[in-house]
Design a protein with these regions (language model features):
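Conserved beta-strand signature within the Rossmann-like core of class I S-adenosyl-L-methionine
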Residues: 99-107
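Core SAM-dependent methyltransferase catalytic element
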Residues: 123-143
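Conserved donor-binding loop and adjoining core beta-sheet/short helix segment
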Residues: 151, 155-260, 366-396
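Conserved alpha-helix/loop element of class I SAM-dependent methyltransferases that forms part
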Residues: 13-33
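Active-site/acyl-donor-binding loops of N-acyltransferases
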Residues: 135-137, 206, 262-309, 366, ...
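A short glycine-rich, Lys/Arg-flanked "PGG" loop and its adjoining helix->strand segment in the class I
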Residues: 86-99
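Short amphipathic alpha-helix that is part of the acyltransferase structural core
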Residues: 142-177, 183-192, 224, 305-345, ...
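A short acidic, Gly/Pro-enriched loop at the edge of an enzyme's catalytic core
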Residues: 65-76
């Protein structure tokens, strides 16, 4: 047993010497200062640090280092930390001065990178460098903590949302989006000051994408990201990846994305899009395919009764989604290739149960068979066509449904229909163009932005992705 312990100590000394000798740690800890080195075998690292001008004290167990005064150290170096990580990081933070450095050196894979990133964020550290070979993390003590949602946070989230987006969001709407989603709840990361004030927020809700490409059919878990915001008083804290939003995004990616979803996506513009692409690995797929139908110029006349009967189409306004919509999705999804899984469970949550939004839901039937559906919202003289799914074997169902909708008393004021109409699948865009839809610049210069995790979907997105406004949180 004694020989085994000696071999283990020798192995650890070699690993630490290789990764954290005078060529490495002086770069990570550039200013000579007071350092506590916590290691089962502190030599030769202690000597290397002392030679670089640091005042070095050592301990084998940080939790037992009671002789060190609070907020007295410039740096703490942890070598292969053992024990409850949360307690260890809390103890290190207590001993560090403001802006003090924490270096973590791991010579074994026992310390999981994801767990460490989350723990550092939640303990009040900003990560300066991470994943250096071998596992070396450098962090700095800060006066903000990043963590996932806790009960009651919505009391600060909703006022911040109102201030950030100039829109009033009810508690019912927030609960629907983040508590009642059938595919997962409370995917929220937040930064708080030491006084408990919400400083930054990043969130998303789970969706499932259905893919049928090259004979393969599968489901891709994803997150639709939105509600990205920072309290104006704290926007000066850090820059880029060390800003409060950057730290919150890193926590979110580690806690909710890596190893859990294929990708996340969202629709944004301006500063947040530039930030996402510069600092958190986002890519812009394309400008949004904004299309407008001028109702006065391109009237969609209803067919006469005789022709209508012969064609066999019937359009109904509906209130809920049932098993017929599951059957439609199974039947037509191969024609769309890649899209959010629009089954009855998702549609019922997304549209039938969504509070504070008046959606108009329509279904079109050929004889007794469901061949398509659509969802609309009315905004003054604009009718927003937010979602749709049609059987391509019944292309006239699109015109039949739109004509019936425009003829309904609820929509008599509509002068335009606006929609995001992708060029994928080709028949879908072709049908829209044949009805008179025209491409226009998207009013807010929004783009489709995504971040891959474990699966890079860009090539498949460009070839096959179908989406509409209802796939965002903007509809």
């Amino acid at each position: 047993m004694e020989d085994t312990n000696k071999e283990e100590k020798a192995r650890m000394n070699r690993a630490v010497a290789d990764s954290a000798d005078s060529r490495t740690l002086p770069v990570l800890l550039p200013s000579p200062g007071s350092i506590l080195l916590v290691s089962a075998a502190p030599d030769p690292l202690a000597a290397e640090l002392a030679a670089a001008g640091h005042s070095v004290s050592t301990a084998k167990d940080l939790l037992a280092a009671n002789s060190t005064s609070e907020a007295s150290l410039d740096a703490v170096v942890l070598v292969d930390p053992r024990g409850p990580l949360t307690d260890i990081l809390r103890a290190a933070r207590r001993l560090l001065r403001e802006k003090g450095r924490l270096a973590i050196l791991a010579s074994t894979p026992d310390l999981k990178a994801r767990e460490l990133v989350v723990a550092l964020s939640e303990a009040g550290f900003v990560i300066l460098k991470g994943g250096l070979p071998p596992t070396v993390y450098l962090a700095r003590k800060e006066s903000f903590f990043v963590r996932e949602y806790a009960a009651g946070d919505e009391e600060q989230i909703l006022p911040m949302f109102r201030k950030s987006f100039h829109v009033e969001r009810s508690l019912a709407r927030w609960s629907w989006e983040y508590r009642e989603n059938p595919y997962g709840t409370l995917r929220i990361s937040e930064a708080f000051s030491e006084e408990g004030q919400l400083a930054a927020h990043y969130a998303g809700y789970p969706v499932r994408f259905h893919r049928e490409i090259e004979g393969r059919s599968d489901t891709l878990p994803a997150l639709q990201v939105g509600d990205t915001m920072t309290e104006p008083a704290f926007r000066h804290v850090g820059r880029g990846p060390t800003s409060l939003l950057g730290r919150t995004v890193r926590h979110y990616y580690t806690r909710f994305c890596e190893g859990q979803v294929a990708f996340n996506y969202g629709f944004n513009t301006g500063n947040i899009q530039r930030f996402s692409m510069s600092f958190v690995g986002a890519r812009r797929l394309e400008d949004l395919p904004f299309q407008v139908l001028d109702v006065a110029r391109q009237r969609l006349a209803l067919p006469n009764r005789l022709l209508g009967r012969l064609a066999g189409y019937r359009v109904e306004r509906i209130a809920h989604f049932d098993a017929r919509f599951d059957e439609l999705f199974r039947r037509v999804s191969p024609s769309y290739r890649l899209l959010v899984e629009r089954d009855a469970r998702y549609l019922e949550w997304r549209y039938a149960r969504c509070p504070d939004a008046e959606y108009f839901l329509y279904a079109v039937f050929r004889r007794r068979r469901l061949v398509g559906w659509s969802v609309f919202r009315a905004k003054a003289e604009r009718l927003i066509w937010g979602d749709a799914l049609f059987d391509p074997h019944y292309p006239d169902a699109v015109r039949q449904l739109l004509a019936r909708v425009l003829a309904a008393p609820d929509h008599s004021q509509a002068k335009t229909i606006e929609a995001w109409i992708t060029s994928r699948p080709a028949w879908w865009r072709e049908k829209a163009v044949s009805l008179g839809f025209e491409s226009r610049p998207e009013p807010d210069d929004l783009g489709f932005v995504f971040v891959p995790f474990g699966h890079d979907p860009e090539e498949e997105f460009r070839a096959h992705l179908y989406y509409m406004m209802g796939d965002s949180d903007l509809f």
